[in-house]
């Protein structure tokens, strides 16, 4: 298994920091990568889940554009942003949040804790949809949560996505490793999960297509899994 603790807390963090080499400043208000702790659960977990939590007990990384006039000017004057957001009365702070990245992997001591999961927003979505299956939050975002799902006493390595505004729960048809690889490839771009599932139908598709290669143009980005070609120079 890839060392995901190192991939996010070292490799991605370095890539974020080096955006300054082409004039883009990014800040990382949250960076957490804790040593591993034993998973406290009687559930039968797939080996890949155990192997991941043997690397780290908690992983969190947030990045956003540094909000200074000289740093944000190229984005605020971008024609796509002007036409699709600013002219439609969306604030710059709203747009800036869309142009950010976040991964928030649940800590090992609560990932399979019943009370913890019942207190999360995704539970209200399940109740609204009258879904009684047991889900466990793996990556908690503001509007989407990537989860594992229990079958009897077994938790297979299959990622499900719960969107606060959706009318169903989505089987992403990927496991933990592919999920984390996709998160890295997208630089944890906000709602990358929706782009992966729905492609061009997702509102975030065009944002990812235009701005990940721009923000990270100091490195080779691979967004092919999202049906985005980044081979051309930016």
Task: For each feature predicted by the language model, list its residue ranges.
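A surface-exposed partner-binding patch
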Residues: 1-143
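Alpha-helix initiation and N-capping motif
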Residues: 10, 46, 173-177, 189, ...
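Short, charged/polar micro-motifs that form catalytic or ligand-binding hotspots
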Residues: 35, 39, 165-170, 194, ...
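A generic structural signal for well-ordered coil/turn residues at beta-strand boundaries
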Residues: 132-134, 155, 175
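Coil-to-beta-strand transition motifs
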Residues: 142-144, 152-157
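Compact, glycine/acidic-enriched structural inserts
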Residues: 158-191
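Charge-dense, low-complexity intrinsically disordered regions
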Residues: 182, 193-234
């Amino acid at each position: 298994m890839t060392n995901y603790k190192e991939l996010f807390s070292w490799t991605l963090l370095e890539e974020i920091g080096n955006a300054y080499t082409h004039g883009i400043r990014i800040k990382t208000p949250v960076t957490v990568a804790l040593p591993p702790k034993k998973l406290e659960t009687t559930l039968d977990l797939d080996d890949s889940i155990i192997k991941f939590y043997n690397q780290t007990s908690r992983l969190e990384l947030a990045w956003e554009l540094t909000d200074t006039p000289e740093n944000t000017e190229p984005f605020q004057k971008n024609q796509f942003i002007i036409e699709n957001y600013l002219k439609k009365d969306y604030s710059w702070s709203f747009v800036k949040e869309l142009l950010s990245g976040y991964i928030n992997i649940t800590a090992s001591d609560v990932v399979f804790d019943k009370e913890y999961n019942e207190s999360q927003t995704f539970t209200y979505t399940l109740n609204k949809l009258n879904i009684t299956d047991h889900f466990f939050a793996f990556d908690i975002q503001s509007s989407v949560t990537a989860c594992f799902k229990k079958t009897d006493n077994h938790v297979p390595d299959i990622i499900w996505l719960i969107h606060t505004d959706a009318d169903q729960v989505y089987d992403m048809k990927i496991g933990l490793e592919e999920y984390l690889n996709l998160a890295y490839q997208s630089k944890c771009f906000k709602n990358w999960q929706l782009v992966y599932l729905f492609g061009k139908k997702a509102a975030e598709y065009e944002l990812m297509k235009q701005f990940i290669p721009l923000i990270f143009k100091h490195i080779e980005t691979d967004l092919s899994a999202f049906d985005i070609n980044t081979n051309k120079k930016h």
